Amino acid sequence: CLALLAIAAFPALPALAADAPALLLAQVYRPGLPLQDYWVSEKYDGVRGFWDGRTLRTRGGETVRAPAWFTAGWPEVPMDGELWAGRGRFSHAQSTTRQQQPGDVAWRQIRFMVFDLPGDKGTFDQRLPALNALVESLGQPWVQAVPQRRVANDAALQALLHRTVRAGGEGLMLHRGASLYRAGRSDDLIKLKTHEDTEARVIAHLPGKGRHA
């Protein structure tokens, strides 16, 4: 019938990943947060990467087809981080991590910025030295532990934010030191930017026209 022909004329949308990893997600910063409880780091504008001990995946659960050398020697320990190409280079990180046939030239510009160990049962205060030791033991320049610091008050936090943004960074992340790794959004992880945007989930990539196609 005509209805069936009409449906068949359009390709099916790609299925959403059914095995999205259970990740810790960030809430938006609000004034009055007890800053003495938090570690602060740069918010890297890249693609969320989750190493489950065998496979590198995105936040949505899609497999990242990195070159074999990129993950060679990685531990069976899960690592949570950001696949990052540098400040102001989100488009390169995004296009590279989507490649079905990974290219060495593009991937040589990607770093895995590790900010947590989801499988560790300790608090973030306890996970942090374990994370730093693990990354150091790998000895791979493209795998780096995200530097963490403390700030004394809101004025110091805002000053750090503006220095980071002026240098080309996206913003800051605040991680509660006493928190366990729990999936979902909570005040355990906070994001702070000079402006906040609304998150949207991509369900399909369709061909288009124009300079952004």
What name fits each language-model region?
Residues 1, 18, 127-130, 187-196:
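Short secondary-structure transition/capping segments
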Residues 18, 30-141:
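Covalent nucleotidyltransferase
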Residues 1-2, 30, 100, 159:
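Hydrophobic alpha-helical segments with strong N-terminal bias
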Residues 2-12:
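Bacterial N-terminal signal peptides
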Residues 26-59, 143-213:
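Nucleic-acid 5′ end/cap handling module spanning
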Residues 13-17:
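Sec/Tat signal peptide C-region and signal peptidase I cleavage site
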